[in-house]
Amino acid sequence: VHEEEKPLIPIPEKILSYYKNYVNDMFLEDGVSYETQKEFEIGYDEASDRITVPIRDDLGNLVGVKGRYFYREVPSDIQKFIYLEKCARSQILYGLYKTINYIKQNRRVFVVEAEKGVQQLWSAGYCESVATGGKKITQCQIDKLTRLCVPIIFVFDKDVEQKELEAIADKFIVEVEIYALIDKDNILSEKQSP
């Protein structure tokens, strides 16, 4: 079964009790305040030595947990990200359950690739964002973004080329306003986003 066809199944909240409720300095150095880390329930899994990022659906139900290797330098034999609790990521706009009211209030949505991007924007006072979980965007995510009925601003990593963003924009119906922030002056490093 294709991932988009799998139902999003809520998992028990008690799963989060397996992880330590710790904030971390790496996210802080990357622009995610301790307060924001607590808001998004960032934690730590001792068993896998990973920072934990709970994944919630549009209604706030826990549907997965993503783990990021705890150290900035990742050895070649270790995956940087794994799902400690798997979910149908292609059906998720990370953060939407928390940011929907800000999206409606500010009449726009910033779309980033990674969950941490939503947290960085939140820390900077831009609470109207969601993450796709990567540069590939699914029809399910396109439909959810379209239903927000607000202008959509893509703020993807610098390594995503303008033609890739144009191809994404072409997947939306013509009535949807699509914008993208692109670093044409080479201010950012490859994995940074505007």
For the regions a protein language model found, what residue spans apply to each?
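Conserved catalytic cores of soluble enzyme domains
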Residues: 135-180
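Conserved nucleotide-binding/hydrolysis micro-motifs of P-loop NTPases
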Residues: 159-160, 186-188
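Short, surface-exposed amphipathic charged segments that create phosphate/polyanion-binding patches used
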Residues: 143-148, 188-194
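TOPRIM metal-binding catalytic domain and adjacent DNA-binding surface shared by DnaG-type primases
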Residues: 1-52, 56-59, 100-103
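Phosphate-handling DNA/RNA-contact segment within nucleic-acid enzymes
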Residues: 46-149, 164
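A short glycine-rich beta-strand->turn/loop micro-motif centered on a GG-aromatic cluster
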Residues: 129-136, 179-187
